[in-house]
UniProtKB/Swiss-Prot annotation:
Domain notes: Has the structural arrangement of an alpha-helix connected to antiparallel beta-sheets by disulfide bonds (CS-alpha/beta).
Effect of mutating residue 50 to A: Shows a decrease of activity on Kv7.1/KCNQ1
Task performed by this protein: Selectively inhibits Kv7.1/KCNQ1 channel (Kd=11.69 uM) and inhibits Kv1.1/KCNA1, Kv1.2/KCNA2, Kv1.3/KCNA3 with a very low potency.
Phenotype when changing residue 52 to A: Shows a weak decrease of activity on Kv7.1/KCNQ1
GO MF assignments: potassium channel regulator activity; toxin activity
Subcellular location: Secreted
Extra information: Negative results: does not show activity on ion channels KCa1.1/KCNMA1, KCa2.3/KCNN3 and TRPV1.
Descriptive protein name: Potassium channel toxin alpha-KTx 28.1
Main location: secreted
Keyword Nucleus: no
Keywords from the named record: Disulfide bond, Ion channel impairing toxin, Neurotoxin, Potassium channel impairing toxin, Secreted, Signal, Toxin, Voltage-gated potassium channel impairing toxin
Family listed: Belongs to the short scorpion toxin superfamily. Potassium channel inhibitor family. Alpha-KTx 28 subfamily.
Length: 54
């Protein structure tokens, strides 16, 4: 039973990370301010038209 709990948690974490990477990849930006909301508490920068969260 412990194996299944760990397995399900792993799937959930990977799904969240994967979805977040897609959201960041799709976010087009012109200035650093465009990335501020996307990156929440971290510093967002605009690199080659895409947001990068530090």
């Amino acid at each position: 039973m412990n194996f299944w709990v760990t397995f399900i948690r792993l799937i959930v974490v990977l799904s969240i990370v994967f979805a977040f990477q897609i959201a960041v990849a799709k976010a087009a930006c012109v200035t650093h301010e465009d990335c501020t909301l996307l990156c929440y508490d971290t510093i967002g920068t605009c690199v080659d038209g895409k947001c990068k969260c530090m």
